[in-house]
Amino acid sequence: IIAVIWDFDKTLVDGYMQDPIFEEYNIDPKNFWEEVNKLPERYLKEQDVKVNPDTIYLNQFIKYAKEGKFAGLNNDKLKEFGSKLKFYPGIPDIFRTSKELLANDPACKEYNIKVEHYIVSTGFAQVIRGSSVMEHIEDIWGCELIEAPDPNQEGCSIISEIGFTIDNSTKTRAIFEINKGINKNQDVNVNSNLSEEQRRISF
């Protein structure tokens, strides 16, 4: 198996996956990211607390949702924003054509060689799931958010807690998880001691 592992923003997407969210809620992205970039220093100074600069933006999204700036923002809504992303030319065609290329090659057929595409991103997993590339992707690693009842709207939910994160360091962990095939075999984890022959995808 040949695994092709992609980043998302500015790699597949022309811009950032949060852009349609800011546009929908009339939030200035420049001001938002300036606020986010100041948070690590602020929390260290005020509370002597270190935060992860790669994922602190998730806290800010949750804060905005609770304050009503991102009114009604939940996982379903995040997924809907995936359909509004603008991909670079050739995306998602490259995923389909690369699979077809190997599937139609006699030598690849003989040795059962195939290609799988993965996305590892510090962005929202739900946004990726709602995008046009998802049907071509074997699996994704991204940030996941937990919902809670929306205090501002009865019967609705909003993003409320952080469930899972990927940052620039744990992207390496994701690569090892793909290597060992933990997404295909629940009995295997990233710390499992597997020989090279036992690993689903070789480096």
Q: At which residue positions do the language-model features occur?
A:
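Alpha-helical substrate-recognition element adjacent to the catalytic core
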Residues: I1-N152
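Noncatalytic linker/hinge segments flanking ATPase motor cores
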Residues: L44-N52, I159-T165, I182-N189
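Conserved phosphate-coordination/catalytic loops
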Residues: F81, L85-P89, F164-R173
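Generic serine detector
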Residues: S83, S98, S121, S131-S132, ...
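Histidine/lysine/aspartate-rich catalytic loop segments that bind and position anionic ligands
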Residues: H136-N168, A174-E177
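Conserved Lys-Pro-Asp/Glu-containing loop-to-beta segment of HAD-superfamily phosphomonoesterases
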Residues: I166-F203
